[in-house]
Amino acid sequence: MTELQQKATSLDALAEIERQVLWLSTAIVHHANRVRPNPGGLKVGGHQASSASMVSIMTSLWFRHLRADDRVSVKPHASPVLHAINYLLGELDESYLPTLRAFGGLQSYPSRVKDPDPVDYST
């Protein structure tokens, strides 16, 4: 159990973690579409609303309820939330956060094969 998971014993603590997850997942998508150089100008992907709709549920699961043998299938457009949670849990190196949809980077749909962080099911 990580330090963050141990702190998530109250609703206030869980709400603070939820804010961090929302901010990180939004920043991951924003960087992919607005910050990373993109000569063609096309949106490369990421769905902030689809991610935001899952932040509360996924934060509660990962920081309060999941047991070691539990497995979760994450809806495809919520992968930035999964990556943010894995980062906060120490299971994803910070260097990957700005790599959504980049070659060799984080996938926009969770992938057990291509993502560098733990994914239970590819979707």
Identify the residue ranges that each predicted region occupies.
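Short, contiguous pre-domain boundary segments
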Residues: 1-10
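Cofactor-binding active-site loop characterized by glycine-rich and histidine/acidic residues
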Residues: 9, 13-21, 25-39, 50-123
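Short, surface-exposed loop/turn segments at secondary-structure junctions
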Residues: 40-45
